[in-house]
Amino acid sequence: MKNLSKNLIYNIIYQVLLYIIPFILTPYLSRTLGVTQIGEYSYTYSIVYYFMLFTLLGINNYGVRKISKTKHKKDVLGEAFSSIYGLQLFLGLISLIAYNLVSVVFLSTHYTILLIHNLFLISAIVDINWFFFGIEKFNITVTRNAVIKILSTLLIFLLVKN
């Protein structure tokens, strides 16, 4: 029960952070970038998001379920992790290649932003949050994600000027 309470607290803190950061960033970015750049960002992000969805393709849910069932059997746990992560890497590689082909062939006017969005796709490919959720180590995932969100926010304020 103690572990469940800690995991719940970690999750609540992270969810609050997920609501606060956009609340702070949206007005700043809207004023700084303007309507055109916000629209271009939203458009290009929606494209990369489809490729991220294909990369993960239910792996988060399946991974948590499979890992939580095998977390006490080390040999089976390693095998489960390898097979799930191998599938994620395979789908991610296909997505990365397809995304860059689409970016070059069909969307060359937005190529620079689409190239930068490769970072989102790569982060989805290497993301193993499902493993840590499966072994009930919420603190690792929440701490890492919170640090990334806070650093990203600080970098946006420092680097996005005009």
Roles of regions detected by a PLM:
Residues 2, 33-37, 51-86, 133-139:
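Transmembrane-helix boundary and interhelical linker motifs in polytopic inner-membrane proteins
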Residues 1-5, 24-26, 38-44, 77, ...:
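Short amphipathic alpha-helical segments, especially helix-boundary/capping motifs
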Residues 1-24, 85, 89, 114, ...:
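Hydrophobic faces of transmembrane alpha-helices in multi-pass small-molecule transporters and flippases
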Residues 88-162:
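Hydrophobic transmembrane helix module of multi-pass membrane transport proteins
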Residues 3-60, 100, 153:
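Signature of the first transmembrane helix
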Residues 4, 8, 56, 80, ...:
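A general secondary-structure boundary signal
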